Amino acid sequence: MNSAVSEAALIGIDWGTSSLRAFLIGPDGEVLEAVSSTRGIMSVEDGNFDAVFHDLIRPWISQKTLPIIASGMITSRNGWVETPYVQVPSGVSDLAAALVSFETSSGINVRFVTGMTTDHNGAPDIMRGEETQIIGATAAGLGDGTYVLPGTHSKWILVENNRIVDYSTYMTGEIYGALRSHTILRTLMEEGSFNEEGFRRGVTSGLAAGINLLHELFHVRTLPLFGKISGDMVADYLSGMLIGVELKAASEAFGKDSAITIIGRGDLADRYELGLELAGLSCRKAPENIVARGHFLIAKSAGILS
């Protein structure tokens, strides 16, 4: 048995739309090992989640029986086991009480974290996976305040007394993909490395756009047409504009008084950090793998760990 497995207390699984991560978690919530895959729920053929699950963590479960907690879109209608939603405000104890147990083909018991839901003027909002990351952030000492989780559907989440009290979803990433690939703007997009000047100009435009967004979007076509921006700036100008609109709306809804915590990885988190700075808002980045801390805290609250 390898030393990491012998020390482990828990396996945490973060299974989203486009990616899959698993963590071997120690007795104090530390990540001992991690593995990842591109087998998000939308790339699993014929709903064969059981096989993907076993393939990913077989080196661990073949050596030791460990409790397993899974979160993310794997609990959605398109996932492995659909779980209900808990209503905000909610915290770690609510999620722990609502865990859904499921037995795999090999007899392993997996506990799935439920999603969360809220209501804005009669329209529901939902999330799956982000709640576990927020629990991990509070365990990491990041505490109360506003969090942004960039992605295809960005989440802005308000935390008070270590409980999620409100949140909103913004379809920024998906709108960007649709505009870039399925509108007249697609003919202007050039592949290349990140163009910071184009992004900065786009954010500035987005922050000022307000209700004029549909008009401002046409400038993504006309600015390069008249040589106001170069071709290699267009994609990042569009990205910046949409992120700027999101930052303006969300910061007004959730407040600007304290530092906004960014939970995310790589280029997209960097873009939001730059965008927030351009908007005059203070921000900080959460440490990596905080979702594993969330798995650990939920498991502990549920009495799964001693």
Residue ranges and their predicted role:
Residues 13-19, 73, 149-153, 172, ...:
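A short acidic Gly-Thr/Ser loop motif
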Residues 281-306:
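Glycine-rich phosphate-binding/hydrolytic loop that grips phosphoryl groups
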Residues 19, 257-275:
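Glycine-rich phosphate-binding loops at beta-strand->alpha-helix junctions
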Residues 10-14, 67-69, 145-149, 261-262:
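Short glycine-aspartate micro-motif
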Residues 10-48:
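Short glycine-rich, Thr/Ser-proximal phosphate-binding strand/loop in the N-terminal lobe
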Residues 44-45, 116-206:
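Glycine-rich phosphate-binding loop plus the immediately following alpha-helix
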